[in-house]
C-alpha cells in the first residue's frame, strides 16, 4: 500500500492541535475534530443497477469493465473516509453471488438467472478490505419481487403457500416458520463462505400494506423469531460478524412528538430497540429520512436506547436531488453534526447521490466533515480481549517515501490465540513523540491488512514519528508500538551528544551547568525546536507536571537573550526517566 500523506491532509502538528482524552463531544464538534471511532456508511444498491453496476457483464471484457466501475466507486468512498459499505446482496429472491438457494439477479449479466462470469460479492469484499473498509451483505428479507419474476416464481414453486401476493409483488409470510428457517440458511451461507464483516437485514418487518390480523405483540414475536433464527445461524459460523438491520426511522411515538403513524414498533412490528438490548443486533441503521422535529428528537431517542451498541442513522441525501425533494444541503449537514454530537454514526442513502455530489454533499463530507479516517467501534459485548501489540517497527527512507514494516503476533495479551481470521493494523503518524494514538488526527491508515506500508513524504509538514497497533475482527485494538529508533536518530542529529537530563514525579532536576548559568528562566522546546513552555526555578529542579508524555529539550534564557542548551529529557507516563 502506498499512501500520500500530503494529499490526504491527515497530518497536523499535534503539539499545537492536541486534545486531551477528556474533551467533550461539543468541543470536538466546535473544533471540527472528528472522533476516532465512528461508523461512516453508505448503502450501495444493486437492484436495477441504480448505484452499481451501470453496465452488464456479458463477456470477459465487459466483466472487467463492471469490476472497474466498482473499484472507482470504492476509491471515491475511501477518499471521503467512508468505513462501511452495505452492498445489496440478496436483491429480490435473487443473489449477486453463486448461491445454493437462489438464482443470480439480472443486475450483473442483464439476464436473471445467468452468471456474470465472476463472484460479485467476493470481489466487492476483497476490494473493500484493500481500502480498510468493512463490507456488509445487505439482505432484503421479506419482499421477493414481482409475482412472476424469477426469484418470486422460484420460491413459490419450492415453498407452496409461503409467498403472499400484495398488488403485483410477492412477500414471504413472516408468520410462517419456514420464513425464519429459510432466511437463516441464506445468511448462514453468506457468513460461512465469505469474509463478510456484517449481515445487514433490510425490510425485516411486516409490509405496510399487509393486513395484520394478529395482535401487534404477536406480530412483534413473529418478526423477532426471524431475527433470532438469523442471529443464531450467523453467530454460530462467525461470532465477530456484525448483525444489523435498517428499521423504520422512528421507533415509536415519543412523549412530545408524534411519529405521524409511521414507526417501527407499532406500525410494522419491529422491536429494534429490544433487539439491541437482548443482543440480537450489534448495530442499527434506522432510516431517518426526515427533517427538523421529525428527525432530531427521534435521533436522541435512538441514542438513549442504544444499550451500548452501535447506532448509525440513515440520512436521506436523495432528497437533495430536485427530482426527489426540495431539501437543502444545510438540512443534511445539520443532521450530521447533530448525530456526531450525540455519539452516533451516519449512513448515506444512497451511494449515487453522494458520489454525484448533490448540492456539494460529497465535498462537504470529504473536505470538511470527515477530514480523517475513523475506526468502527469495537464489539466489546462480544469480546474484550486485547491483541498483543505489534513489534519491531522499522522505517526505511526511499527517496521521498518511507517504508514502515512491523511484525504481528496472532495472540491476545492473555496468551490465547486470536480467534478471528485476521489481524488488522492501524497506522498513526505525528510530529511529536510518542504518537498519540487516541487523537483521530494522527490516524493515517485504518484496518489495513499486511505488515508494510509505503508513505509519500513529499511536502514540508510531514510526520517524523509513527506508531502501529493491532486490531482483531471484533475491533479490539492493542497498545501501540512506537517508532522509538526515529526519536534517537533525531536526538543525535539535532543535539549531537546532548546530555540526558533526569526527571521524576513531575520534577526536572537541573544539571550543575544550569545552576551556574546566568539564566533568568528556562525554555522547554520540542525536538523540532518549537517553544512550548517557559519555566522559572528558585531551587534545583523545575516543575514539569503540566507537560504531557514526550521528548523535550531544555534551554536557558538570560537577560541578553542568549540561549544555552542543557540537554534533553523524556517524560513517560507511570515511569521514571
Can you annotate each of these PLM segments?
Residues 134-146, 200, 219-265, 311-314, ...:
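Aromatic-lined carbohydrate-recognition surfaces of secreted/lumenal glycan-active proteins
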Residues 272-273, 277-295, 312-383:
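Substrate-binding cleft of secreted/luminal carbohydrate-active enzymes
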Residues 364-417, 475-490:
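Pro/Thr/Ser/Gly-rich low-complexity, intrinsically disordered linker/stalk tracts
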Residues 457-477:
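Beta-strand-rich modules
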Residues 80-116:
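Aromatic-lined carbohydrate-binding/catalytic grooves of carbohydrate-active enzymes
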Amino acid at each position: 500500500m502506498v499512501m500520500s500523506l500530503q494529499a490526504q491532509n491527515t497530518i497536523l502538528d499535534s503539539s499545537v492541535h492536541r486534545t486531551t482524552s477528556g474533551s467533550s463531544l461539543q468541543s470536538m464538534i466546535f473544533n471540527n475534530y472528528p472522533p476516532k471511532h465512528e461508523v461512516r456508511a453508505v448503502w450501495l444498491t444493486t437492484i436495477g443497477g441504480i448505484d452499481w453496476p451501470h453496465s452488464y457483464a456479458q463477456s470477459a471484457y465487459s466483466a472487467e469493465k463492471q469490476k472497474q466501475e466498482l473499484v472507482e466507486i470504492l476509491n471515491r468512498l475511501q477518499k471521503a473516509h467512508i468505513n462501511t459499505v452495505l452492498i445489496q446482496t440478496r436483491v429480490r429472491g435473487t443473489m449477486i453471488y453463486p448461491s445454493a438457494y437462489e438464482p443470480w439477479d439480472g443486475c450483473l449479466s442483464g439476464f436473471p438467472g445467468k452468471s456474470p462470469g465472476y463472484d460479485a460479492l467476493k470481489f466487492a469484499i476483497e476490494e473493500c478490505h484493500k481500502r480498510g473498509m468493512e463490507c456488509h451483505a445487505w439482505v432484503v428479507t421479506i419482499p421477493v419481487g414481482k409475482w412472476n419474476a424469477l426469484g418470486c416464481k422460484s420460491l413459490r414453486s419450492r415453498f407452496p403457500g409461503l409467498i403472499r401476493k400484495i398488488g403485483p409483488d410477492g412477500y414471504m409470510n413472516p408468520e410462517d416458520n419456514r420464513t425464519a428457517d429459510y432466511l437463516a440458511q441464506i445468511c448462514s451461507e453468506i457468513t460461512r463462505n465469505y469474509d463478510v464483516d456484517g449481515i445487514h437485514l433490510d425490510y425485516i418487518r411486516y409490509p405496510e400494506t399487509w393486513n395484520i390480523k394478529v395482535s401487534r405483540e404477536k406480530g412483534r414475536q413473529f418478526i423477532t423469531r426471524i431475527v433470532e433464527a438469523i442471529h443464531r445461524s450467523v453467530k454460530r459460523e462467525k461470532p465477530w460478524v456484525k448483525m444489523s438491520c435498517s428499521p423504520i426511522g422512528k421507533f415509536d411515538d415519543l412523549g412530545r412528538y408524534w411519529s405521524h403513524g409511521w414507526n417501527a414498533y407499532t406500525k410494522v412490528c419491529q422491536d429494534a430497540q429490544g433487539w439491541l438490548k437482548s443482543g440480537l443486533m450489534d448495530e442499527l441503521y434506522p432510516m431517518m429520512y426526515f427533517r427538523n422535529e421529525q428527525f432530531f428528537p427521534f435521533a436522541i431517542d435512538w441514542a438513549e436506547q442504544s444499550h451500548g451498541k452501535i447506532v448509525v442513522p440513515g440520512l436521506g441525501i436523495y432528497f437533495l436531488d430536485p427530482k426527489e425533494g426540495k431539501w437543502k444541503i444545510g438540512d443534511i449537514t445539520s443532521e450530521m453534526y447533530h448525530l456526531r454530537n450525540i455519539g452516533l454514526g451516519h449512513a448515506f442513502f444512497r451511494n449515487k447521490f453522494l458520489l454525484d455530489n448533490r448540492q456539494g454533499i460529497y465535498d462537504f463530507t470529504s473536505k470538511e466533515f470527515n477530514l480523517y479516517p475513523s475506526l468502527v467501534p469495537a464489539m466489546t459485548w462480544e469480546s474484550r480481549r486485547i491483541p498483543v501489540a505489534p513489534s519491531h517497527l522499522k522505517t526505511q527512507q526511499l527517496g521521498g517515501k518511507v517504508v514502515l514494516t512491523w511484525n504481528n503476533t496472532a495472540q491476545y495479551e492473555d496468551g490465547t490465540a486470536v480467534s478471528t481470521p485476521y489481524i488488522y493494523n492501524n497506522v498513526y503518524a505525528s510530529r511529536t513523540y510518542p504518537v498519540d494514538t487516541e487523537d483521530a488526527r494522527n490516524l493515517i491508515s485504518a484496518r489495513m491488512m499486511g505488515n508494510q506500508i509505503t508513505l509519500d513524504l513529499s511536502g514540508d509538514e510531514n510526520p517524523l514519528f509513527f506508531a502501529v497497533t493491532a486490531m482483531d475482527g471484533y475491533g479490539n485494538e492493542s497498545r501501540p508500538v512506537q517508532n522509538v529508533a526515529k526519536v534517537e536518530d533525531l536526538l543525535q542529529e539535532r543535539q549531537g551528544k546532548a546530555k540526558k537530563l533526569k526527571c521524576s514525579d513531575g520534577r526536572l532536576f537541573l544539571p550543575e551547568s544550569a545552576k551556574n548559568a546566568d539564566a533568568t528562566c528556562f525554555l522547554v522546546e520540542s525536538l523540532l525546536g518549537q517553544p512550548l513552555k517557559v519555566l522559572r526555578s528558585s531551587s534545583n529542579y523545575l516543575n514539569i507536571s503540566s507537560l504531557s508524555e514526550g521528548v523535550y529539550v531544555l534551554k536557558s534564557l538570560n537577560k541578553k537573550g542568549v540561549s544555552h542548551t542543557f540537554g534533553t529529557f523524556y517524560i513517560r507516563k507511570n515511569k521514571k526517566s
